[in-house]
Regions:
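Intrinsic-disorder/low-complexity signal
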Residues: 1-214
Length: 214
């Protein structure tokens, strides 16, 4: 995809704009309840009360990581450039997915995003939440320390996941938010912790989700 080539796919997609302090996402209580930890592969049903807006925060020390999100169809691929959310294109689907600013919290570098499941187009079946390292600088996920993803719903329910510090990968699918329907039951939204990735960084992540790399 031309969008990715224009911003330097082999590394971190171009120079990072100036960072700002991370503000608390709209709709999330200032004093939120304790978050439930998730194990790799574990999934949970997201309560209806939390679906208006999900706050996503990734934090880590050590090497810098960039948060990226992909809006995926039922076959696990993007529909086009518009479904790739990163710091040069921080909004998708009319604001249903928005990448927020970088900041710091508790000694960790943080980056935020919001996902509004109810506002996503019907063709979007899942949102992949990933982090990628700067392969041009030779960094990988093994250099991340105290990495932590927190997802919190509009009503304050929260979940956390500690992704593995794997030196063999430089882009990782950390978690995904997805539609689920079992038989005749009503559709629900679920959150799954993943923690798997690609040794060739963002290029591998992109190819795995239908982005053509020349």
């Amino acid at each position: 995809m031309e969008l990715l080539h224009q911003h330097g796919l082999s590394g971190r997609l171009g120079a990072r704009p100036g960072t700002a302090g991370a503000a608390r996402p709209r709709g999330v209580p200032a004093r939120a309840a304790r978050a439930e930890p998730l194990a790799p592969g574990q999934n949970v049903v997201l309560p209806d009360a939390d679906l208006a807006e999900l706050s996503v925060v990734f934090g880590a020390a050590g090497a810098e990581a960039d948060l990226t999100l992909l809006l995926l169809t039922a076959d696990g691929t993007v529909r086009g450039d518009q479904d790739f959310v990163f710091y040069h294109q921080p909004r998708a689907a009319g604001g249903a997915v928005v990448l927020g600013p970088k900041g710091t919290s508790g000694g960790l570098a943080t980056e935020t995003a919001t996902i509004r499941p109810r506002s996503l187009p019907a063709a979007v079946q899942r949102v992949a939440v990933s982090v990628n390292m700067d392969t041009d600088a030779g960094t990988d996920c093994g250099q991340l320390r105290d990495a932590r993803l927190e997802v919190r719903g509009a009503a304050g329910t929260g979940w956390t996941f500690t992704p593995p510090a794997d030196p063999g990968i430089s882009a990782m699918l950390v978690a995904e938010v997805y539609r689920h329907r079992a038989g005749a039951a009503d559709e629900v939204w679920k959150l799954r912790a993943v923690g798997q990735g690609w040794s060739d960084g963002l290029a591998g992540l992109a190819r795995a989700h239908g982005v053509e790399i020349e």
